[in-house]
Structures are given as structure tokens and as C-alpha cells.
Amino acid sequence: MNISFKNILHTLLLWCITLTLGAQAPPAKQANDNAFNSVSYRPLTPLKVNGEQGVSAPFAGSIYQNLIVAGGCNFPDVPAAKGGTKRFYADIYELPHPDKNPNGQWHKIGELPKALAYGASVTVPQGIVCIGGTPDGKNSCAEVYLLHTDAHHKLQTTPLPALPLALDNMTGAYGGGYIYVAGGLHNGETVNVAFRLRYPHGKTWERLPDFPGRPRVQPASAVQNNATASCFYLVGGFAPANKTERALAHTDGWCFNSATHQWTKMADIIPHGQTEPMTLAGAIGITSGCAHIVFVGGVNKQVFEDAVNRPLLIEQTENNLKLAPTSTLQQQLDQLNKEKAAYMNHPETWYRFNNELVIYHTITDTWVTESQSPLLARAGAAFIQCGHEWIIVNGETQPGIRSSAVTGVKMDMRPTFGWINWTVLIAYLVGMVLLGYYFMRREGDAEDFFKGGGRIPWWAAGISIYATMLSAITYMAYPAKAYATDWTYYPMLVTILIVSFPVIKYYLPFFRRLNVTSAYEYLERRFNATTRLMASGLFIVFMVARMALVLYLPSLALTAVTGIDLYICIVLMALVTIVYCTMGGVEAVVWGDVVQGFILVGGALFAVGYLIWGTEGGLQGFWQIGTEYNKFRLFDWSFDYRSATFWVIILGGMANNLISYTSDQTVIQRYLTTKDEAGARHSILLNGFMSVFVSIVFFAIGAGLFTFFKTHPAELDFTMSKGDTIFPFFMMSQLPQGLAGLLIAAIFAATMSTISSNINSVATAFSVDFYKRFCPQATNQQTLRVARSTCIIAGVLGMGIALLMATWEILSLLDFFQEILGLLSSGLGGLFLMGIFFPRIGGKSALVGFVCGVCMVFLTRYLTDTSFLLYGFIGMFTSVAVAWVCSFFLKEEKNLKGLCWKTIQH
């Protein structure tokens, strides 16, 4: 069968164009309807504490997936409307996991140390932490204890550090390694306090800055990530009336940033598309996904404020009547007294308790409502997280009336990929495999497999370098980073062009003129065999780790938009990539990169246009919103070495890119595929300019994602578990079928270009640096077989680590990748730097410096707060400095002709 490269390329492009032109628009959505999320409700076994009543304001949580409710209060004998007395309980009830025991019943399993209600409770891995509360509605408690079970599954109570201030009617939340409490009453007096306890190792509660504004009683809260850190969000609640101010149901919220230790104001609770603010007094906050908080229940602002302010109005009217009695004032007083008497006797619907899910997004600072249900209309209810289901327990449906209802609420995503998208994606994958098959048939020997026979044009090599270094990390994580923060990472990409000039002048001549196949051959000639083997081995470890990450990213995207299991996606992607790159060698990899590069850039340009066009106000809205929220900020001029400030970005970017472009076999191998040194120079410069100018598109995508979802917050996936999936989510939720499939194929292109290059470079490093060195008599065909076997092994190892990585909590995959780069590769850059520019440094000194540099990076990582962006610079500087000092004590004589910059010039 005669398969030509042009036929493969033309067929692939024809498939994409034809299917894209036949794209189908996504289904129309009603106003404020999210077609990506579905909400379901189910009634569970009621909890009846006294007669038909439940309780309000209990402690609640789960222990070994069983539901636990403790304490609470109600009016058991005479209703509150008739002057009944509130009773507080100490009883602890348990319900077996609803899915494992659908017919399970609540049963009493013990008692609290005393009757309590209106405290805060959070579920931790060890059990349920119960905080504060009141035994009588007057006196506050400071006790904190852990409800848990012993080895015999018997309920136990273990004291924890007490609150510095006794509190009740406050709120509490757990996350980021801390338990937070804020607001409430101290023996009847409202307070603005906030505390946190490091759990489980904290010995005392830390006093946080008081939150701004008036105090809050019965606010809601949650711990959730914002763009950069874990934060405590305090929302709603009410401020009781005092001598100078009326009672106020708060419609705002405040965010405590755990990194900056400061409170910042949240947007007022005005859901998108509405004009009237809401309150969340008596509501509960639930963390959803990686950046959403769902609030359930709570009172109606107008009805509640009228009720709590009515006694004050009556008093004021009575005083006015005494001073100047009029019939109008008397009528007002009569009406107020009538309303007061009738307040407790209306039907449930009159009170208008919140019956919607009120959802806040921490990145865009927006509110939406979703899914009305009468089952949600409760205040003072308890919340229990049970797997992916939210259990809402009891609470009151109107003042004084406690519900016994227990409701399960589940929010799921309903992704659909569609046959057109699948066809586009499969056509692309098949085309790449055919490309590999074509070049496998052209291959002659190991030299072709490793260097492509020197037949690669300089422009193709340049595009290949760009596509290889781009990867899915750039295609997904850079837009996600710009969407969540700003453009402060962009100058790092400019340093690629800056680094290109010293690479061309000082490094390229060594790799081309010494005619090496592996970059680490130079290290043996310059230093010794140990240095070469150690460097090559470390490179292989780094490449396998990198393969795992760039395998994980697109699999994450495919899972987010199709619903296919993440682990299946990883395995599928790995197998396709292994087959493709094992067959065709570096020539297939390079030409595959060229095709993939056009798909990547074309897809990105289209996405930018669509995002700007879809933002309310178009280009003007895009610019205004982006400017207002500092989405285009390029520089942080502070001198904080712990964050992405300008000098950290520049210093770290220069070091990390110098490491990649001077010691990474994946890149250096491209220098060796061109016909001559001039072609290699041109390819490096082309990559540098593409990195500067094309990367603007990816940051514009990030800003566009922010402006689009800022103006369409109801279109977000409220359950999105990884922030890096925001771009592929946009593709699938907003773009027509076919176009979406093509952009998803672009993510696969980014992945395959990087993975195939990594696998090929690992095979080169192992075959040349280890196999051929220890088996010098091996033939070219034997070396080729070893190289292909290494491709398979390396790919499988990368796949295994990617499967493990899927279980980790990583806030930003871009940050994680840069951290791995600094930890594992800084020493390699140092070796090439000292080899070329420091002729007095010998092999022994280089090894000592290398080890010290790696150790310094790990010490910096685990003992300081230094930004991960500086790890590469720290490691490289330390290794060179230590090696240079050691060279005065460990002197070595060696002929360095042609092996360092001084001698190669001659």
C-alpha cells in the first residue's frame, strides 16, 4: 500500500473542515437555565425528635458515612405562636448511609455532655467537631469537642481546645487545614469576632482580624479556593436592632484570605438577572467543585426585617402618641400590633423562605440562583455531606415550626460530546497514527529514528520545538491561570526569546560540532562518565514525570466534557500516543508537531474571537471588564519572593527556560534534525518569536473566559472540580458540535506533540547513554529495537504516574509543573553552564556542585515559602557556585580543546 505524507495531511484537514462546516449548535437554553448541571432531590427518613417535630440549629455531620445529628431545639408542648417554651436537647441520633441502607431508621446512640443548640459543627476525617452553642438561649458556651467512635464503634466525646470567647448563633466551616468560626452572640451580645484552629494539630484558637461592618448573627459560611489560595467566606446573617440602628438582614459577604490574612468584600447577594438583593440569614453554605459555594435555605429579607423591627416601630409609635396623639398614629399603632399578633400564624408560603439554590462563584465574584424546590425552604437546618450528596436535616419551615424532613440534594453534570465531535476527534487520532506508520516505512536505521537523517527543514524544526514546549499545559493551564488571576505569567514567555540568543551563540555550537546524538554525551567528554549517566538518568526521571502531567491534563479535559472515567481517558491517551511515536521516530514526531501546531494556533485564534464576541458588550465589554478587574495586569512590582512578582517571573523564567533549551534532550534533539547549524539557529529563533506572539492568544483566552463568564455566570459548571478544565468546558458548553470537537482535538494535539517528543527523547537518552555505552558492539538494528522498547516502557511508566496524579489535589497544574521543573531539572542546567563557561571546574567538582544544587532546591521547597518559580535559578546558581569553589580543592587536568567556550572558538 502506497501512503503519501501529503495524502495523510490532506485527508486529515478535509475531515476537520467538512465536519466543522457541518457543526451543530448547542441546544437553546432558557433564561438562567444551566444545561450542564442537573439538580435532583429525594426525601429520606424523617428525623422526629418529639412527636412529629424535628429540631432547629443542631450539630450535624458524618462518621464512617453514617449521618449524625446532635442537640438542637424546638417547641415540643405548646407552639411558639401560643407562647410555648423552647426546649434544648442533648440527644444524638444516627442514620445509616442512605444508599447502603435505604430503609434505615434514625436511632438514638448517645447524648452530648449537655443540651445545646445554635453552635457550629464541621465534619473532619476523625469525626464531627462541635463548637460552642447555648443551653438556654441566653448563655453562650466555649467548649469544643470531637464526636467520634472508638475501635468498638462506640460513640466517644474528646475535648478540643476551647474557644477564646464563648459563642452561639455563629457560623463555622472547615477547609485548608483550619476550622473557622465567626460572628454570633456572646451571652446575648453581638460580636464581629473570627477565630480559626489548625486541625488536628492546633493547640489554641488563633484570633483573626474582626470582620468589617455590623455584627452578624446566624450567618452562613464555607471554605473555598479563590484564584490563588484557600479562603473563608462569611455571608449574610443579620444584625439585631440596637439603640441607634434598626435590625438589618445582611445582603453582603466578606472573604478572609488565608495567604494575605485580610478581609475583602464580596459582591452583594444580587443574583445575575435580578435587581433586588437577597439575604442568607439562617442559611447553610456548601462547598461545590473547585470555586463555587452553594447556599441553601434562609429567611426572606423583607419579611424578616419587618418582623424583627416591628417591636421597635411599635415602641417609637407609642412614644410619638404620648407626645402628640393623632388618629393617624393610632391607626399605625393598631396596624403594627395586628401584624405582630398575626405574624406567627400565617401559612408557610407567606414567609417566603428561600427555596432556591443560591450559588456564588469565587473567581468572577458573581451570584446566580438555580433549581427551585419547596424542600429547600427552611432556616436553621443542618447540613451533612454524604459522598456527592448534600443532606439537609430538619430546620424550621416558618417561625417556631420545626420540620422533621430530611432531604437529599444532588447536583450532577450532564456532559454530552456528540457524534460529530467524536468523529472529528477520531479522524484526527487516526491521521496521527497513519503519519507514524508512514514514517516507520521510510526509516532506515537508528540514526533516522533519533535524528531524522538531518532532513528536517529549519521552519519545521522551529514549529516542532514550539509545539513540544507548548503542550496541553500551555493550551489549558495558561488560559486557566489568566482567567483566575491576570497576565503576570506572560513575561516568563518573553524570556524564551531572550534566552534564544545566548543559546544560539554559546550552546548550539557544542551540540552541532561535536556531532552528538544525546546531549549528555557532551558531559562525558567534558567531565566524566558518571556525570553523563547521572544527568541522563535524571533527565529520564524528569521526562517521565512530565509525561504523566501532560497525559493527565487532556484526560482531565475529556472527562469534564464527556463524562468518561478519568482513568480510562488516561489509559486511552497513553496507548494512542505510545503507538504513534514508537512507530515513526523523530521524523514522524516533528511533522506531527507541524500539523498539530497549525491546529493549536488556529483553534486558539478562533476561541479568542468567540469569547470576545460572546461577552456582553463585545470588544468594548471585554476591555472594560478586563480592565476593571485587572485581568490585563502584566507586572507585580513588589519585592515579595514568595509570589509571582515581576523580578521573580523574570529571574525564574530566564533560569527555567535556559535549563529547558540547554539541557533538555527533547529540545536539543530538534537542533540536531536540521541540515546544518544555520538551520538550527533559525529554528530556535522561530520558536522564540512564536512563544512571544502566539502566547498572547492564550492569555487573551484567559481574559476572555473571565469576561464571558462574568457576564454569563449561570453558564458555569457549578460542580467543576479542577480549575484547569475551564477552557475545555467553555468549548463543550458554548461552541457548536464539530468546532468543539476540533478544539478538543487541539488539546490532544498539544498533548501528543509533547508526549511523543518526550518518549522519543527518553528512548534516545537511554539507548545512547546507557545501552550503546555498555554494549558498544550493538548493531543499529539492535539499538533501534531497544529504542522502540524504551518508548513503550517510558510511556507505560508515564501513564502509571498520571493515574496516581489523578488522585492528588492540585490547585493549579501550571504551578505544579513549574515546581516539578525546578525540583528535578535545575541541576542539569547547572552542569551545562559550568561545562561551557568554567574550564577550571572538573568532573568531581561538577558532581559535588550538582548534588548541592539539588539538595538546596529541596531544602528551599520544604523549609521556606520561596516561590517555586525560583527553584530553577536557586538550583543552577548553587550548583555552579559550589562547583567553582570546589574546583580550587579538587583540581583535575584534562584536555578541553573544543569542549568549552574558550577553546571552541579556536
Label for each model-derived stretch:
Residues 1-12:
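Bacterial N-terminal signal peptides that target proteins for export
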Residues 13, 26-416:
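Kelch-like beta-propeller repeat domains
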Residues 16, 73, 130, 141, ...:
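Generic recognition of cysteine residues
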